[in-house]
Amino acid sequence: MPKPTKGPRLGGSSSHQKAILANLATSLFEHGRITTTEPKARALRPYAEKLITHAKKGALHNRREVLKKLRDKDVVHTLFAEIGPFFADRDGGYTRIIKIEARKGDNAPMAVIELVREKTVTSEANRARRVAAAQAKAKKAAAMPTEESEAKPAEEGDVVGASEPDAKAPEEPPAEAPEN
């Protein structure tokens, strides 16, 4: 059940705060990035991310839930047609807040909040590392049978190793798992 915000609100009453957040979210989805004060950006982030999560699901019920919050049908269409599918494989973290210099006049702390449009460098690097490790493992597995077939004739003539009951095969170092 939704609980009212305790303490100071953005600009006064709770209804005014809802209107501010709806307008900020509309501008964010329309333009991709907006410049606002830091407290407004911090309040907008979870609000906008919940709306994007609704858009990822894409059902009619989710569209109606978003239309309760955002009144602009064009922005809701953009949210469901473009923004939601773009973030389909991302679990949260759809927005980024970047602090900028304080506003002249009243020295209010300012920030830019924007939709994260690029893939993360670390996820691409991890994917490349996993692919390289899988290829190396496949290459090593393909090379192992040829080495064993070349080594078998030498082992058949070697009776000393076979007659010892406690003889152990040389241990191979464990295959390294790719780092995440």
UniProtKB/Swiss-Prot annotation:
GO cellular component terms, semicolon-separated: cytosolic large ribosomal subunit
PROSITE patterns: RIBOSOMAL_L17 (PS01167)
Xref: SUPFAM superfamilies: Prokaryotic ribosomal protein L17
GO terms of molecular function: structural constituent of ribosome
UniProt keyword Ribonucleoprotein present: yes
InterPro entries: Ribosomal_bL17, Ribosomal_bL17_CS, Ribosomal_bL17_sf
Keyword list, A-Z: Ribonucleoprotein, Ribosomal protein
An example Gene Ontology biological process: translation
Subunit and interaction comment: Part of the 50S ribosomal subunit. Contacts protein L32.
Protein's name according to its UniProt entry: Large ribosomal subunit protein bL17
